[in-house]
């Protein structure tokens, strides 16, 4: 019986790019190669319009499972390759149709003749291929408007591709084409989703997490490491910077009026993150803020917090409600990690009545009474940095190291 030999990848949004399209295609190819590292027999050919993945005996389901998380892929089809002869095409179409899983009652045939010298025209091929499927199946009908399955045939010189198992990719742009940002990763539900959506726009991310021992636990720190690890499903790696924040928070609690302590804390986080961004050649800062969700996420608060950085602040969740954010968190695998009951530094010294309309002038006046610069310098200098990769890649590297 014929088996799937290829996966044909369609780019989606990348097709709108002009002269720099080759850069996008090259980056996507590199990302796919990295994602499929554990499949040594695979061959990848990336053209201007699509990507061809030759399986060479590798399990198509296992490969598909990893492909679906690669940004830059709009859709992909499992494909069979047959000689460009009518009988081979008919048998290939039937074999592909029979491998489709689920309750299938209707189908249609779509033919694209890239090879214009093929002796039959498209309108002649449609009844030939469709009739062959009808003759060899039961309780199946043709529906050209809303079929359960679309059997696609691409005829080329010498060979043809047969496809009907179409799967959705992650969409967006390949990670790496849009520069790098620093993501404030708190450990809650929102910030991992913000990181995910930032990566979807082709941007590489490094994460910054503020922890305040002994007020925050090692389990809270591990939760953030696990979140960063989960995000590596969608990129090559995530660099995580763990910033000690205890002394900064204790000083804020002592020196700043409680109503402004949350605002000043966020401003200090921005200052520290900007310093790390400069070190790491990042171009922006991403946060998980959603407008009006909590006191520190009003327009007034954001206006006051933004004052302390010259970097663009990207807020992918700004117009989403909590249920929308939770839905994405569940889909990308971060929700169950985020709801582990371990407190982060944002819950330490929480004021009873935080200002919802803080003013820049007041924040500056309160901060001017104490020199926070040495504390910021110390926090940046004492940060712990770790590089996280997908579990499969780490296992392969460890296996390689054991050989020596």
From Swiss-Prot:
InterPro entries linked to this entry: Rossmann-like_a/b/a_fold, ThiI_AANH, ThiI_fer, ThiI_N, THUMP_dom, THUMP_ThiI, tRNA_STrfase, tRNA_sulfurtransferase_ThiI
Keyword Cytoplasm among record annotations: yes
PANTHER family linked to this entry: TRNA SULFURTRANSFERASE (PTHR43209:SF1)
Gene: thiI
Gene Ontology molecular function terms on file: ATP binding; CCA tRNA nucleotidyltransferase activity; tRNA binding; tRNA-uracil-4 sulfurtransferase activity
Lineage summary: Bacteria, Bacillati, Bacillota, Bacilli, Bacillales
Stated name of the protein: Probable tRNA sulfurtransferase
Gene3D superfamilies membership: 3.30.2130.30, HUPs
Disulfide pattern: none
Oxidoreductase among keywords: no
Role summary: Catalyzes the ATP-dependent transfer of a sulfur to tRNA to produce 4-thiouridine in position 8 of tRNAs, which functions as a near-UV photosensor. Also catalyzes the transfer of sulfur to the sulfur carrier protein ThiS, forming ThiS-thiocarboxylate. This is a step in the synthesis of thiazole, in the thiamine biosynthesis pathway. The sulfur is donated as persulfide by IscS.
Catalysed reactions, as listed in the record: [ThiI sulfur-carrier protein]-S-sulfanyl-L-cysteine + a uridine in tRNA + 2 reduced [2Fe-2S]-[ferredoxin] + ATP + H(+) = [ThiI sulfur-carrier protein]-L-cysteine + a 4-thiouridine in tRNA + 2 oxidized [2Fe-2S]-[ferredoxin] + AMP + diphosphate; [ThiS sulfur-carrier protein]-C-terminal Gly-Gly-AMP + S-sulfanyl-L-cysteinyl-[cysteine desulfurase] + AH2 = [ThiS sulfur-carrier protein]-C-terminal-Gly-aminoethanethioate + L-cysteinyl-[cysteine desulfurase] + A + AMP + 2 H(+)
